[in-house]
């Protein structure tokens, strides 16, 4: 039993010793291995602080890479470096805008420069010996393998196999925008422009003695240049660089001004144009592929290409393009390009595109351009030379025809003074009814003929606070439009007869009156002395000269085709609008054709009844002499009446008219009541009651306040008939106080309007006033005011037409009654 137990103890001791020896041997091997790796690490061309911290795998990886590089370098024909080249080696990497990377045919990075940390954030020792596929974008692996492949097939004669490589590679970057380093797991993709070539190294020269032939060594040597983002460009751009922005279809949306100095283009002429229009044709394929890579990988560098200049030739340009993405939806928004012009304009006399021919070819002048230049020349040309030029170009004659909408300027060839003609053309009085008269003295006659309003005459408003008898409600009805108050009509000439030299001289010498009271018409001196027409001219100043072109009518105009007025009653006869024909036919002397209708009236009265006229003239002259100068203040400003349309509306809208029947078309406005006449005669006794009623002063009188005689007179006037030889007057004015013989009431060529103003007075009893109205061609009336704001009834053309006097004198004052009435008035 004891022997068996001792044997077991010996076995245990021997196994423990073997295990210990095995552990010691393994420890010895590891220590030796560590020593070998330590020695190997120190054999690598690395700094001591780096090599001392390498693990075994890193030492093996770096050693293998070093051996491959050594093999690569031994295969090449390397010159012996002198001291100068050794000193310059440190500047090569600084001159490069990237790092150097050497790849094997299987993608291992056997060499990478130490400045890779500056661009990618990863150190040289972390990348050397690793596969490039571990640090590149998965979408770029296929392209990377294609770039590493070297085809050894047969090459066509005259062609060498292309070993140049240029591609874009997205690689992991641990650098932030602020230059800090992040974890490799949080790295972003950075686009590298890799350019280089494939080297094939034949190692048969170092063939061992055993006779084994090694395959040639293939490697790809690249210079990797990262593309900076436009927002991170630190170096300021020089004068040979310009910025541009494009849409996704590569059309210009912005361009820097420096392109004008470099290539001749203006930034405005490039907007909206595609950049493909300015590429050289030989570089279009390369740039098309580059743009495809830009949209795929986000950034590209075009390399050097030719871009056409404006006036011919081209320049070499290198562009860095970056796709700008929307921060909200990460969709591409635009493209920003940094263009580096690396040369001047080459072959500037050579044309490569149609855009360059626009600056070389002369523009063809069309006939339209020639005609424009012909008429816009500053120097004046003779009309004969102008005709010769137009004759040589018949196509240009069509441009002389006026088109629709062209302004036609009438030329005045009567004057030789150029300056005065220009001034007249500048001051032609257009629409003088609303414009001020021209200050030019040469245009005074034109203004007088064109303007219906006198220059110093200001239309008074209809409503006045100084009128106590004005009803506010009536004023509102009678003043719908203030513009109608500014319209006026003047009396046209009776005949189109050339004025006498005396008339012409009078018009030229006499200035335009400042007020209507200064209006006057001139007659013979004997008639002035006999009738004292100065008072009449101021009382009834009526401009008989045609100044309104719209109201001027020819007396020979036949108005037979106009429809006559047909009332609803059957007691009216149809008659024609034969204006002033009896007046013209009865004129026997040249003086009767004068524009002054008042003179004609006086002349006709003298011819028809010499005896009665003498009596009337004597009575009228005596009465007019009694008028004192202080009573002339009662004569107010002459204000023209509105149009007959307004008068008709006012007539039909009278509120208290005695003819209020809706079916009666002969209703006339209200007449002034006795209260107004009483107030007038009490305030100014023994004075001529020659008054005019303005449109704003018409008052409404109830029917019960009207005198029965006035009602009888108005009813009689409604029933009168029109004679075939009676004259129709479209405008009525207040005439002078004249007496008409009773015998010639039917044969007189002028129809007189008589209105009787009756009043009952305690002292004088019943008084009658006869107002004789002078005929005119237009609807105008004389409006005036007295000191006590009273007035006479208003007579319109409507009253003249309907209430014309008839034969018979049963309603007219005759003989002594007329003289008595005149005495009472005065």
Curated annotation (Swiss-Prot):
Indicate the impact reported for residue 391 to R: Abolishes 1 sumoylation. Abolishes 1 sumoylation. Abolishes 2 sumoylations. No change in HIF1A protein turnover rate but increased transcriptional activity
Q: Where is this region: C-terminal VHL recognition site?
A: 556-572
Q: What is the effect of changing residue 803 to A?
A: Recruits CREBBP. No enhancement of CREBBP by Clioquinol in the presence of FIH1. No change in nuclear location nor on repression of transcriptional activity in the presence of histone deacetylase inhibitor
- Per the record, the covalent cross-link Glycyl lysine isopeptide (Lys-Gly) (interchain with G-Cter in SUMO) lies at 391, 477
Outcome of substituting residue 400 to A: Abolishes VHLE3-dependent ubiquitination
Segments of this protein annotated with the region NTAD: 531-575
Does the record carry Acetylation as a key word? yes
Upregulation: Under reduced oxygen tension. Induced also by various receptor-mediated factors such as growth factors, cytokines, and circulatory factors such as PDGF, EGF, FGF2, IGF2, TGFB1, HGF, TNF, IL1B/interleukin-1 beta, angiotensin-2 and thrombin. However, this induction is less intense than that stimulated by hypoxia. Repressed by HIPK2 and LIMD1.
> Which residues lie in coiled coils?
none
| Region span, Required for heterodimer formation with ARNT | 170-191
Q: Name one GO molecular function term.
A: DNA-binding transcription activator activity, RNA polymerase II-specific
Q: Which GO terms describe its cellular component?
A: axon cytoplasm; chromatin; cytoplasm; cytosol; euchromatin; motile cilium; nuclear body; nuclear speck
This protein's source sits in the domain of life called: Eukaryota
- Composition bias of kind Basic and acidic residues appears in 8-30
What's an example Gene Ontology biological process for this entry?
positive regulation of neuroblast proliferation
**UniProt-annotated stretches for the region ODD:** 401-603
Q: Which UniProt keywords apply?
A: Acetylation, Activator, Cytoplasm, DNA-binding, Glycoprotein, Host-virus interaction, Hydroxylation, Isopeptide bond, Nucleus, Phosphoprotein, Repeat, S-nitrosylation, Transcription, Transcription regulation, Ubl conjugation
Identify the residues that the record assigns to the PAS domain, covering every copy: 85-158, 228-298
What UniProt notes about the protein's domains is: Contains two independent C-terminal transactivation domains, NTAD and CTAD, which function synergistically. Their transcriptional activity is repressed by an intervening inhibitory domain (ID).
Q: What does this protein do?
A: Functions as a master transcriptional regulator of the adaptive response to hypoxia. Under hypoxic conditions, activates the transcription of over 40 genes, including erythropoietin, glucose transporters, glycolytic enzymes, vascular endothelial growth factor, HILPDA, and other genes whose protein products increase oxygen delivery or facilitate metabolic adaptation to hypoxia. Plays an essential role in embryonic vascularization, tumor angiogenesis and pathophysiology of ischemic disease.
Tell me the protein's name: Hypoxia-inducible factor 1-alpha
């Amino acid at each position: 039993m004891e022997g068996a137990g001792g044997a077991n103890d010996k076995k245990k001791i021997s196994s423990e010793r073997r295990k210990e020896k095995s552990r010691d041997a393994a420890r010895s091997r590891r220590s030796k291995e560590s020593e070998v790796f330590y020695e190997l690490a120190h054999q690598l061309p690395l700094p001591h602080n780096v090599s001392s911290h390498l693990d075994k795998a890193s030492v093996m990886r770096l050693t293998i890479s070093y051996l491959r590089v050594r093999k690569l370098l031994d295969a090449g024909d390397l010159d012996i470096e002198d001291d100068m080249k050794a000193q310059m080696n440190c500047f090569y990497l600084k001159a490069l805008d990237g790092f150097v990377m050497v790849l094997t045919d299987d993608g291992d990075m056997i060499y990478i420069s130490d400045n890779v940390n500056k661009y990618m954030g990863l150190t040289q020792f972390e990348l050397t010996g690793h596969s490039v596929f571990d640090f590149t974008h998965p979408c770029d692996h296929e392209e990377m393998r294609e770039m590493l492949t070297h085809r050894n097939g047969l090459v066509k004669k005259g062609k060498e196999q292309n070993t140049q490589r240029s591609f874009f590679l997205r690689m992991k970057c641990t650098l932030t925008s602020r230059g800090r380093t992040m974890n490799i797991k949080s790295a972003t993709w950075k686009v590298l422009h890799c350019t280089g070539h494939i080297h094939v190294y034949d190692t048969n020269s170092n063939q061992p003695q055993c006779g084994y032939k090694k395959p040639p060594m293939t490697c790809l040597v690249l210079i990797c240049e990262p593309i900076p983002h436009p927002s991170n460009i630190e170096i300021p751009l020089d004068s040979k660089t310009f910025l541009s922005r494009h849409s996704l279809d590569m059309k210009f949306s912005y361009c820097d001004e420096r392109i004008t100095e470099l290539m001749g283009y203006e930034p405005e002429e490039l907007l909206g144009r595609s950049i493909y229009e300015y590429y050289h044709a030989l570089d279009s394929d390369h740039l098309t592929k580059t743009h495809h890579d830009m949209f795929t990988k986000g950034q590209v560098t075009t390399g050097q290409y030719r871009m056409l200049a404006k006036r011919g030739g081209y320049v070499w340009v290198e562009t860095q393009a970056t796709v700008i993405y929307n921060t909200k939806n990460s969709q591409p928004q635009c493209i920003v390009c940094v263009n580096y012009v690396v040369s001047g304009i080459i072959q500037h006399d050579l044309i490569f595109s149609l855009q360059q021919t626009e600056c070389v070819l002369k523009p063809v002048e069309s006939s339209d351009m020639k005609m424009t230049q012909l008429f816009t020349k500053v120097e004046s040309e003779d009309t004969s030379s102008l005709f010769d030029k137009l004759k040589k170009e018949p196509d240009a004659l069509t441009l002389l025809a006026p088109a629709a909408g062209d302004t036609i300027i009438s030329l005045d060839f009567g004057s030789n003074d150029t300056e005065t003609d220009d001034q007249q053309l500048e001051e032609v009085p257009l629409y003088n009814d609303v414009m001020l008269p021209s200050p030019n003295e040469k245009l005074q006659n034109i203004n007088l003929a064109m303007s219906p309003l006198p220059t110093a005459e200001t239309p008074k408003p209809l409503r006045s606070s100084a009128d106590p008898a004005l009803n506010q409600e009536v004023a509102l009805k009678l003043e719908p439009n203030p513009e109608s108050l500014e319209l006026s009509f003047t009396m046209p000439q009776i005949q189109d007869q050339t004025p006498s030299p005396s008339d012409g001289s009078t018009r030229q010498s006499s200035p335009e009156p400042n007020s209507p009271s200064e209006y006057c018409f001139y007659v013979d001196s004997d008639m002035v002395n006999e009738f004292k027409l100065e008072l009449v001219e101021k009382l009834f100043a009526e401009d008989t000269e045609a100044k309104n072109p719209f109201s001027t009518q020819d007396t020979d105009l036949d108005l037979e085709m106009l429809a006559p007025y047909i009332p609803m009653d059957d007691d009216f006869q149809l008659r024609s609008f034969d204006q002033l024909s009896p007046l013209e036919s009865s004129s026997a002397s040249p003086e009767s054709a004068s524009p002054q209708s008042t003179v004609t009236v006086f002349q006709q009265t003298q011819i028809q009844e010499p005896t009665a006229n003498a009596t009337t003239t004597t009575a009228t002259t005596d009465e007019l002499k009694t008028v004192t100068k202080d009573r002339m203040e009662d004569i107010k400003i002459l204000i023209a009446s509105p149009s007959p349309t307004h008068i008709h509306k006012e007539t039909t809208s009278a509120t208290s008219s005695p003819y209020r029947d809706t079916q009666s078309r002969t209703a006339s406005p209200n007449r002034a009541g006795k209260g107004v006449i009483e107030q007038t005669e009490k305030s100014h006794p023994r004075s001529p009651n020659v008054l005019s009623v303005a449109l704003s002063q018409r008052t409404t009188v109830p029917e019960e306040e009207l005198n029965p005689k006035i009602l009888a007179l108005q009813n009689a006037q409604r029933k009168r008939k029109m004679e075939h030889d009676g004259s129709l007057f479209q405008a009525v004015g207040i005439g002078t106080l004249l007496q008409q013989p009773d015998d010639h009431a039917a044969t007189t060529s002028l129809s007189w309007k008589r209105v009787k103003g009756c009043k009952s007075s305690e002292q004088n009893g019943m008084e009658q006033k006869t107002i004789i109205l002078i005929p005119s061609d237009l609807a105008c009336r004389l409006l005036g005011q007295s000191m006590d704001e009273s007035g006479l009834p208003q007579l319109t053309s409507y009253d003249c037409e309907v209430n014309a006097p008839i034969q018979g004198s049963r309603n007219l004052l005759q003989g002594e009654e007329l003289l008595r009435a005149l005495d009472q008035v005065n």
